[in-house]
Amino acid sequence: MRAEEHAPPAAPRDALIVAHGAPADPAPQESVLQALAAATAPHLPPGWRIRGATLAAEGALDAALDGLHAPLIYPFFMAEGFFTGTLLPRRLAEAGATEAEQITPFGLYPALPALMARVALAATTAAPASTNLLIAAHGSKVSRTSADSTYAMAAALAPLTGFARILPGFVEEAPFLADQARALGHGICLPFFALEAGHVTDDIPDAIKEAGFAGPILPPIGQHPDVPALIAAALIRAAGA
């Protein structure tokens, strides 16, 4: 039984899920965040209010914050870094959300490895011991945090899955996704991404095709139907801390 199941119900809070979004085409991702907030709401105790916004959509963050009191901010990001450590706090301050409380981002939530393992195992068509897992992730040319969180996820998945090999591959840094896919040859590709944006729809399939990797590319983990419940659990836990 999870720790949050032992805790008394948290007092009603306001909350906001925030993602980076897509600056070139912000509207679709903005809609996804609002839908995610709506899907999370039923998992929260009565009285909670939750909204979603992206940083990329002009005015969206300010509009989402309007009327919220001391909201919990849920960063829908896969790692700590510039966006969670610098840009998001700055944008919150500029919006006047001085009482907002930012919590751990999605990619570092302790329950995420179990979901990743369950999703990957459900996609296997052979014994796990003969199956490879390729974790497709963003990476960064300037920061180690994205890679570090991906390697930590790979390490957490090893005992949970029993896969033959688990390799991370990155879009923006070495070891690049195509190289890791080529090294594995076959298996399952699970994108360690929050949203289904350009890297997921274009870069990952291109790298897999270039490598001749045999196996399915699963939807990004952030789009799994169980994610709203994970977000709600994280918010409830943060409110009761």
Where are these regions (language model features)?
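Active-site-proximal alpha-helix that buttresses catalytic centers in soluble enzyme cores
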Residues: 1-241
